[in-house]
From Swiss-Prot:
(2R,3E)-phycocyanobilin 1 binds at residues 35, 39, 149-151, 153. It is found in: Plastid, Chloroplast thylakoid membrane. One of its GO terms (cellular component) is phycobilisome. It is a peripheral membrane protein. One of its GO terms (biological process) is photosynthesis. The keyword Endoplasmic reticulum does not apply. (2R,3E)-phycocyanobilin 2 binds at residues 72, 77, 82-88. The lineage of its organism: Eukaryota, Rhodophyta, Bangiophyceae, Cyanidiales, Cyanidiaceae. The light-harvesting antenna system in red algae and cyanobacteria is formed of phycobilisomes. These are composed of the phycobiliproteins phycoerythrin (CPE), phycocyanin (CPC) and allophycocyanin (APC). Cyanobacteria also contain phycoerythrocyanin (PCC). The phycobiliproteins all share the same subunit composition and organization with variations in the covalently bound open-chain tetrapyrrole chromophores. Contains two covalently linked phycocyanobilin chromophores. Its main location: plastid. This is C-phycocyanin beta chain. Heterodimer of an alpha and a beta subunit, which further assembles into trimers and the trimers into hexamers. The basic functional unit of phycobiliproteins is a ring-shaped hexamer formed from two back-to-back trimers contacting via the alpha chain subunits. The trimers are composed of alpha/beta subunit heterodimers arranged around a three-fold axis of symmetry. The phycoerythrins also contain a gamma subunit which is located in the center of the hexamer.
Amino acid sequence: MLDAFSKVVAQADARGEFLSNTQLDALSKMVADGNKRLDATAAISANAATIVTNAARSLFSEQPQLIQPGGNAYTNRRMAACLRDMEIILRYVSYATIAGDSSVLDDRCLNGLRETYQALGVPGASVALAVEKMKEAAIAFANDSSNVTIGDCSALISEIATYFDRAAKAVV
């Protein structure tokens, strides 16, 4: 964002002009959009433990075989690994949200995840369902009007949903 400000100032300075109302309005909109992005990311980050825990509870309620003997989340070690992976995915979704770009999610989290899960025998469909459950909860927190700067956040909420969709698709 600072680069955008520097660019506008440099252009005005090169012309020997003050910033125009149009330029100021564009910068103001960029700041407002950035504030919404910050608010949404803060809401997701502040509620990360709740998002992950509730998604896991819901998943294991729907698929109890995962936590029964022989299931992929059976034993404390496997359960902890499952919760850790869910938290990592959520963390990288929050990074993509603040950056407004999925490359950090793709490059540092999702690339190779399907292959890793297949090699470990982790059921991708179950992970995808857990991601979907996290998506629902995270969007509810991010879209809570008490947490977000006033204004239309529908485009941002839609963008956040696509990050979760990318993650769910990456594991199946």
